[in-house]
Structure formats: structure tokens, C-alpha cells
From Swiss-Prot:
Matches recorded under Pfam families: PIP49_C
Signal peptide feature range: 1-34
Role: May play a role in cardiomyocyte proliferation through paracrine signaling and activation of the PPI3K-AKT-CDK7 signaling cascade.
Organism of provenance: Xenopus tropicalis
Protein name: Divergent protein kinase domain 2A
A GO CC term assigned to this protein in UniProt: COPI-coated vesicle
Main subcellular localisation: cytoplasm
Gene Ontology terms: biological process: cardiac muscle cell proliferation; regulation of phosphatidylinositol 3-kinase/protein kinase B signal transduction
């Protein structure tokens, strides 16, 4: 009986797929004219498509000239707006061309789904007018995004604390860094807010509240060795970042030597974001195989989704000395039945000088046998060679890093794991 039900379900699933494909074909045939025009027209030069008409309720304008000049165009099937229905994250691939440099691939992001962007518009309107629809441009001047006028000297923690993960517990030092490195102004380099235009201040604050990823990329740039994708610019509600390469997930079944190297890099990223010369701890609150990519030439691992990064100023923690500030904090292992689970307390991340969160996140969600993603298990270091499996050291270190049995076991095992992976990687070369 069970087998019969399974067969029936299988047939129904196949029929559903066929019906879906047929429906899609019909829709495409009915929209042949619009499909052809989509291929012929470069919508990245359209102000309304870019939501440039909504500025300053947007993310910036630094790249608008490049968009309007036709220097950016969607790749292949990405030109079909019909397929946007399936692109929930609103992430697109495009070609960007410079006259003397040729073209290269870039990634375009709207920083949210259509639903999230629509909700943003409604919140702005309700705040300003009490109604869900309004003139966004006028409404922006009646919101918290416009509360900082030209007389305000600094962006201070009391204004933006808790707006997003980036500023869950902001220090003045962090906010000065965000303003000084803000790329959507011609006069960047100063931490004084009054050097920004009114519209630029509003765009900065809106980005900080809606999705601070651009500000993370600008404040901790790849040019200075931070493991994030390079920020290029914005036009309206379309942000351009450098294309890194295939996502980490595509290397899940790569040769063992390659996976060992990637695992070592991931642990190095965890270390860099936790302990660095700037005394900022950047904690990754969303860690999955989709949030990292690998460069095709240099094989370098880069973070490509930085929306959920909490920055704690360890210099301020050491200065203010909140309760238990110097007690090492061990993150709690989360044995949940969902993908990419993490257990953390933002308040503790903000108040302890020594935290193992990044090691925990990388080990549990990417490297160890506890990592699950898209129906797979075993993590990036699954199925090691027989001699390594027999030795047992790798499995023991991964287990202790993900789910420590000893006090402060994760701190010790993370350090040993980095060293062991470096050794394995060197031996494989």
C-alpha cells in the first residue's frame, strides 16, 4: 500500500512538473512580443526600473551615469522580466563595460525581495502620512531618515542603535568609520555628517536600516584585505558589486585537496573577523554555502552576502568593562533539524571581548558532519581519504569545534584545526 501511494505521488509530481512547464510555455507564447522587446531593450537604462524616481528613498546614485550610458546590461536569460518571478532574492548577473578595459561580470542586487521593498515604501508612507501609499520623495523628509539635518555634526549611537545587525551595538568609532567610508557621496573621507547632502544622509540611513550590506562592504573593503566582495556603486535601488565566482556550494563534491584548502580559508576568515588589528569583531549571523563564493583564478573564498553581520567594538568593551566582559564566551551548539541553524545572543556578542561565535558558525554550518544543506549532510569535509579517516584527528577537531565537550574546547580546537588544515593543504600541493 505504501509503495502504491509512493508511485502515485511520483506520478503526480511528474504531472505537476509537466503542467508547470506547459503553463510557462503558454505564458511565454502569449507574451512573445514583450519577450522580444525584453531582449532588445536594456532596462538598466530605465530610471523607473532602477527605482531612481524613488530617491532619496534609495541606496545611492554614484553609478547612475554608468547605468544611463548603457555600460551595464543583463546577461542572457536575465533579460527576461518574466523570470523575475523565480528570482525572489532579486540578485542578477550583468556585464559591465569600460571603453578601454572591455567588459566584466558584475552582480546587481536590489537588497531585498519585491515584497520587502514594497513594505519599505508602505512604512515610509505610513510614518509620514498615515497612509500606505504616498509621494515617497516628499514622505522621506518626514521620517527618521531625515531627522539629521545639516547642523548635526556626527552620526551617534543613540540615533541608529538596533536599526540592523550592523548597528545592534554601535560605537562612535564604528559610526565614524561608516560615514567616512560612505561611497555614495563625492566628498567621502570625512566622518562629519554635515559634509553630506541632505539626500545622501537619508540614503545612508535608509540603507543602514533596510539592508546594511553595502555599508559593510564599504567600511571593511576587499582592497584592504577584508574577505568581502568589492562594492562598486548604486543607482536608485540597484547596487552593483564585483562578481567573485561560483558559490561555495558548487565545490561540495570537489577533489579532497580543493575542499581542504577551502576549509582552511574559511577558518582563517573566522579568525580574521574575530581577531584583527582594528579591534572590531565582525560576527557572521547567517552562515550557509550560498553566502560564500570562490574566485576561479586565485581560489580565494569571499563572503558575498553580508547583510547579517554584527560588528562589536572590542576596544569599547575593554574600556567600558560591562559585567563579565572578560569571561570567554562559548556559543551553544544548536542541534536543530533545519538548514544553517545558529544559536547566539546579540547582547552577549556585544558585551564580551572573547567570543567563539565565528568558529562555531563555520564549523557547525559548513565543515563538520552536523552541516546540512540542500538535502546533503557531512559538511564540506565529508568523505576524507582513508588514512585521514583512520587517524581520526580531523573528525575529532571538527566535532569539538562544532559541539565542544570540554570547557573552552572550541577555542583550542579551532586553533588546532586551522593548523591541521594548513598542514593537510600544504601536503596536498
Amino acid at each position: 500500500m505504501l509503495r502504491l501511494a509512493s508511485l502515485k505521488f511520483g506520478r503526480l509530481f511528474r504531472y505537476a512538473k509537466v503542467l508547470f512547464a506547459a503553463s510557462l510555455l503558454v505564458v511565454m507564447l502569449l507574451n512573445t512580443h514583450s519577450l522580444l522587446s525584453s531582449f532588445q531593450r536594456n532596462e538598466l537604462t530605465d530610471r523607473r526600473f532602477l527605482s531612481l524616481n524613488k530617491c532619496p528613498a534609495c541606496f545611492g546614485t554614484s553609478w547612475c551615469r554608468k547605468f544611463m550610458n548603457g555600460q551595464l546590461s543583463f546577461e542572457g536569460w536575465g533579460r527576461l522580466r518574466l523570470l523575475d518571478f523565480f528570482n525572489v532574492k532579486n540578485v542578477h548577473f550583468a556585464q559591465y563595460g569600460e571603453p578601454r578595459e572591455g567588459s566584466r561580470r558584475v552582480v546587481l542586487k536590489r537588497l531585498g525581495s519585491n515584497h520587502e521593498l514594497s513594505e519599505l515604501d508602505q512604512r515610509i508612507c505610513k510614518k509620514a502620512t498615515g497612509r500606505p501609499r504616498c509621494d515617497l520623495v516628499q514622505a522621506m523628509y518626514k521620517t527618521d531618515f531625515a531627522r539629521l539635518n545639516g547642523d548635526v555634526r556626527l552620526l551617534t549611537p543613540d540615533v541608529v542603535e538596533g536599526w540592523s545587525d550592523l548597528v545592534h551595538c554601535p560605537s562612535q568609532r564604528l559610526l565614524d568609520r561608516l560615514v567616512r567610508r560612505y561611497a555614495e557621496t563625492k566628498d567621502s573621507g570625512s566622518f562629519l555628517l554635515r559634509n553630506l547632502k541632505d539626500t545622501e544622509r537619508m540614503q545612508l540611513l535608509l540603507t543602514l536600516a533596510f539592508n546594511p550590506e553595502p555599508l559593510v562592504l564599504q567600511s571593511f573593503p576587499s582592497d584592504e584585505g577584508w574577505p568581502f566582495a568589492k562594492y562598486l556603486g548604486a543607482c536608485g535601488r540597484m547596487v552593483a558589486v564585483n562578481y567573485v565566482g561560483e558559490e561555495l556550494w558548487s565545490y561540495f563534491n570537489a577533489p579532497w585537496e580543493k575542499r581542504v584548502d577551502l576549509a582552511w580559508q574559511l577558518m582563517e576568515i573566522a579568525e580574521q573577523l574575530t581577531n584583527n588589528d582594528f579591534d572590531f569583531a565582525l560576527y557572521l549571523l547567517d552562515v550557509s554555502f550560498d553566502n560564500f563564493a570562490v574566485g576561479p583564478r586565485d581560489g580565494k573564498v569571499i563572503i558575498v552576502d553580508a547583510e547579517n553581520v554584527l560588528v562589536a567594538d572590542k576596544k569599547l568593551i575593554k574600556q567600558n568593562k560591562p559585567e563579565n566582559w572578560d569571561v570567554w564566551y562559548e556559543s551553544k551548539f544548536d542541534d536543530c533539524d533545519k538548514e544553517a541553524c545558529l544559536s547566539f545572543s546579540k547582547e552577549i556578542l556585544c558585551s564580551r571581548a572573547t567570543v567563539d561565535h565565528n568558529y562555531y558558525a563555520i564549523c557547525q554550518n559548513l565543515l563538520s558532519r552536523h552541516a546540512t544543506w540542500r538535502g546533503t549532510s557531512g559538511g564540506l569535509l565529508h568523505d576524507p581519504p582513508a588514512e585521514i579517516a583512520k587517524d581520526g584527528r580531523l573528525e575529532a577537531l571538527l566535532d569539538e569545534c562544532a559541539n565542544p565537550k570540554k570547557r573552552y574546547g572550541r577555542f583550542k580546537s579551532a586553533k588546532e584545526l586551522r593548523e591541521y588544515l594548513a598542514q593537510l593543504s600544504n601536503n596536498a600541493r
